[in-house]
Amino acid sequence: MEKSGGIREESSEKTFSDFNLDPRLQRAIHKCEFEKPTSVQSETIPLALEGKDLVAQARTGSGKTAAYLIPILELLLKQKQIDENQRGIFALLLVPTRELAQQVYNVLEKLTAFCSKHIRFINVATNSSDTVQRPLLLDLPDIVIATPSRCVVHVASGVLPLDKLKFLVIDEADLMLSFGYNEDMKTLSRSLPRGTQSFLMSATLSKNIASLQKLVCRNPFILAVKDKEASGKLTQYVVKCSEQDKFLLAYILLKLRLIKGKILIFVNEINRCYRLKLFLEQFGLKSLVLNSELPVNSRLHILEQYNKGLYQIIIATDESGMMGEIEELENNVDFVEEEVISTDQPTLDKMKDQENADVNDESILAAAKDKSKKKKRVKQDKEYGVARGLDFENVACVLNFDMPSNTKSYIHRIGRTARAGKPGTAMSFVVPKSEVGKHKPTSLESCKKDESVLRRLEKKQISLQPYSFDKNQIDAFRYRMEDALRAVTTVAVSAARAAELKQELLISEKLKSYFAENPDELLSLTHDTVSSVRLGHTQRHLRHVPEYLLPKGMQAVNKDIGFVPFKKNNRRKVFKSRKNPKHRHDPLRSMKRKS
């Protein structure tokens, strides 16, 4: 196995013109406003153009998608110049989720803006039927984007021939096996022709990478890339609080706008998602919900409109992190995640042994007890994932309302912010063991592992700063939080979940039919409508924050309320008198005379 020379830093001198790319491809790159190649692009593109197999590890948001698409398109365009009439499926791009497949498709559309007549591609990871996809595949597009499960189905049916395949990409490779694609990947590896150039792209290195590498790669270059400039702009905070105080802090952070910009909130359960949504609604804070129950068309449309800036808050469930934990327990191994791997560190196998030794025995036992319960819970769309690989644009803050169950999931979550050199903030709520289970309505089983996950993050030298609040000022808001939380009952959460699912199913059908014919009206479609579920204890005054509760720095400087006339408006009085005439309250006049 060939290995590159340790950490690769970004070279500010390199430009895309240094790669001698096709002019059409360079124009598309310029149109995408890519000023210069990122670290992973600077290292990957030259090696890929030489025909090398690559295993590239870089932080999320570092441009890994373009890092493999650009060299593949360049080599395909050169091939087309030699023989323009050659037909076949030359590139297969495998991704773990449907959302990521659509994202790759969108990037591919932009990069082929000036060569779309010569490069044809298709995304078969959608929820369209096989009868629709079959003729499109029989037309032999140059590039196919798919999840492993969809790919295996089409290969078995004979409509996806791989005999002419030249490029294989496994994006988010560290997640492929944890998503349950073990057998699918083994089946596909037996169908690959010899000499296929393989790309394994990942945000972390794990045992899964080593097993996939043996299946599809031949003497790959292993690139562990760190972009100091990008990673330095991510600020990570941790807040230790009780389960109930999570809701209090979320209310304060969002209502007082202590976090400015778009926010992505992660929770660990679908019911938790709707509980938080209903809670925030009572304070006039609208939010979107993303989970595996929603139709894929609705999920993609929500993501698209969030990226356009139409919405500010998304509450997403990260059930894939729970699935990854189950597989770790069943295989009796623990994932190894490293943001940077240098040449003077131990080998991959030694690091795995060290990581296994660090696992908290108590957390393993607790997770094993809940294994069957978790398996029942993960019955939704297997190919759903929002924490992994998706490009949420301009996210100012990632809020881990519920701490992820492993460090690998944490790295993927916080990677949704501070992308492409922009600053970002990640904040995590950690529940101490002494506080777990004290407030049953807001209690969550996964909170038992919060402290063990935090210790493992600290061992990996991930910089987590404490975020301090003034306790006296926080307690002043507590009664408002308790009033709102008391109204969000289990029955209300279940009703909201059912109502939203029904609404989104209807919207999904409209997206497929009506809005296909009326694209202009698509903008009027909203996903953040206030829940129709009536909460018995909802109080209007919660939407307004009294000035006496605000910190001194946030109180209004100008307290002049303007001109108040001395003369009263008597119209209201006249209206009341007409509406409730005095004779109705006069017992003598209200009596009816008997004939």
UniProtKB/Swiss-Prot annotation:
UniProt-annotated location(s): Nucleus, Nucleolus
InterPro entries reported in the protein's UniProt record: DEAD/DEAH_box_helicase_dom, DEAD_box_RNA_helicase, Helicase_ATP-bd, Helicase_C-like, P-loop_NTPase, RNA_helicase_DEAD_Q_motif
SMART domains assigned to the protein according to its UniProt record, in alphabetical order: DEXDc (SM00487), HELICc (SM00490)
rRNA processing found in the keyword field: yes
GO molecular function (one): RNA binding
Motif (DEAD box): 171-174
Parts forming coiled coils: none
Domain Helicase ATP-binding: 45-223
Chain spans, region Disordered: 574-595
One cellular component (GO) term of this entry: cytosol
One Pfam family hit: DEAD
Domain (Helicase C-terminal) ranges: 233-485
Function, as annotated: ATP-binding RNA helicase involved in the biogenesis of 60S ribosomal subunits and is required for the normal formation of 25S and 5.8S rRNAs.
Family per record: Belongs to the DEAD box helicase family. DDX56/DBP9 subfamily.
Protein known as: ATP-dependent RNA helicase dbp9
Species: Schizosaccharomyces pombe (strain 972 / ATCC 24843) (Fission yeast)
